[in-house]
Amino acid sequence: MEFWGVAVTPKNATKVTPEEDSLVHISQASLDCTVKSGESVVLSVTVGGAKLVIGTLSQDKFPQISFDLVFDKEFELSHSGTKANVHFIGYKSPNIEQDDFTSSDDEDVPEAVPAPAPTAVTANGNAGAAVVKADTKPKAKPAEVKPAEEKPESDEEDESDDEDESEEDDDSEKGMDVDEDDSDDDEEEDSEDEEEEETPKKPEPINKKRPNESVSKTPVSGKKAKPAAAPASTPQKTEEKKKGGHTATPHPAKKGGKSPVNANQSPKSGGQSSGGNNNKKPFNSGKQFGGSNNKGSNKGKGKGRA
């Protein structure tokens, strides 16, 4: 490999011709310092009658640019600058890769071409011969052997089918047994669940009977409450016995003549009547009972007149 470079002047194109069996590689281009600021220079190359733009240089922004261009034949470099020169640099190298490729191709082709050809032919030939022999032997013998060979196969197939069906039947029976066992287990579980559900329901009627008993007992307490009012009348009777007189009933009858009769009929009364003669009985006489007898006689007379 050898370094290479060329300076291209304004308005002048520079031709470059690579040597035989060699290549020219352009890697970089740059401007001189004499170029004014703000001026841009366009770089171009002409190969085989075609002019191509390869880049643009500027003193302020892009004073140099990198390339990776390889040429194996004559080419021409130029630029659009008016005062500055453009320098192209790179290197030369021998064209060795082409020889390597050709030699490798030449070596690979003879080795690859003859090797697969005989193997393919022999394999195909052997296979073809085997196929022909296999075809000719059964053709020589008629189809008498085929039915004999097919019958045991069919019998074997029938037997295998029968075995498969019997196995399937056994599996189905097993499945039915398993299903029945599962159903029995489910029924037992359901019965147990029903028993468990029924057991907590038994105390409910007991609770329901309790309020009925309390309700039936309440009227009994009401009946017993009636004699409780009796003690209220006992002190009055004792006072009447002490006084020897009989008080009038709290609710007098509408007819005036019946009240004295009721007073005489009562066993506990002092034997008073509506008439004044009954008030003179000896067991009612006395100073202690005088006032009560007079009051009773007066009440009886008044009621009889009414």
Swiss-Prot record:
Region (Disordered): 97-306
Compositional bias annotation for Acidic residues: 97-110, 152-198
GO biological process: chromatin organization; DNA-mediated transformation; negative regulation of DNA-templated transcription; polarity specification of adaxial/abaxial axis; root development; seed dormancy process
Cross-referenced Pfam families: NPL (PF17800)
Localization per record: Nucleus, Nucleolus; Nucleus
Entries under Gene3D superfamilies matching the protein: Nucleoplasmin core domain
Bias kind Basic and acidic residues: ranges: 134-151, 199-212
Signal sequence bounds: none
Phosphoserine: modified positions: 259, 266
PTM-bearing positions, type N-acetylmethionine: 1
Gene Ontology CC: mitochondrion; nucleolus; nucleus; plant-type cell wall; plant-type vacuole; plastid
Region called Required to repress transcription, residue ranges: 2-5
InterPro entries: NPL
Tissue: Expressed in leaves, roots, stems, young plantlets, flowers and siliques. Highest levels in ovules, embryos, shoot apical meristems and first leaves. Also expressed in somatic embryos.
Main location: nucleus
MF-aspect GO terms: histone deacetylase activity; hydrolase activity
Subunit structure: Interacts with DNMT2.
Record family assignment: Belongs to the histone deacetylase HD2 family.
The protein, known as: Histone deacetylase HDT2
Species: Arabidopsis thaliana
Classification of source organism: Eukaryota, Viridiplantae, Streptophyta, Embryophyta, Tracheophyta
